[in-house]
Amino acid sequence: MLGIGGAIFYVPFLYGTGMELLSAITTALLLNIVTSGSAAMLYLRKKMVDLQVAVPLILFAAVGTQIGGYLARLTPVNILLLIFSIQMLFIGTEMLFARFEKFYRGKEISGKKKKILIIIGGFVIGILSGLLGVGGGSFVVPMLIVLGYGVKCAAATSGFVVVFASLAAFLAHVWTWEPDTTLVLYIIVASFLGAQIGSRLMYSRIKAGTLRKILGVMLLVMAARILQGLLS
């Protein structure tokens, strides 16, 4: 619904069930492909996705995911958890208070600066996807708003980009993956249904403000639990 993908929630949830972190990241990427893919199909039918900016982002993200996947295998688990929890704190706070949104909303970049931002943005999305398994949507949405896109178009285009960024990152991780097939299938079905509901809510006239705040609180709670585990 918000175009950021669900992996930011999947990773801490799966890790909290006892799954190893890299396995949780790989599973989250697969779920991101399913959920963002199901939502992206609706966005494409409704012509809400701007392919002119989505395709370049996907291409550069595909390169970044290989770098991120390589770094994930070299980085100690505690460091990955720390980076992930910091990102969760930032995104959760932004969902609640929209402080950063006030900075980028109303600004618009065009010309050469736009091309440079797309290139850098694609790499960042890819690295985040490969390193943390988050899809990079939390970075894409504000970037597209800065490029002059409306909120709904930015969220829809971001959701489309997240599908392919997650796919590239999944391929970078899958060779080390040992999944619990039954658990993964159950979560895929639940996530697919949730994505369909969320995408339809976004296309309707229902405001996303309340949902943003609920998700923001959830992220802050999960980040606090991860940090508590690291400090204990």
Region locations from a protein language model:
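Membrane-interface alpha-helices at helix entry/exit sites of multi-pass transporters
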Residues: 19-27, 52-53, 148-159
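Membrane-helix interface "capping/anchor" motifs
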Residues: 1-6, 45-50, 147-156
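Transmembrane helix boundary and interhelical junction motifs in multipass membrane proteins
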Residues: 2-11, 132-143
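Hydrophobic alpha-helical segments embedded in the membrane of multi-pass proteins
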Residues: 115-123, 142-146, 159, 163-167
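Transmembrane helix-bundle signature of multi-pass membrane transporters/permeases
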Residues: 25-33, 155-163, 192, 219
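Juxtamembrane transmembrane-helix boundary motif
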Residues: 11-17, 21, 41-126, 147, ...
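Membrane-embedded alpha-helical segments of transport systems
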Residues: 30-37, 63-64, 71, 161-168
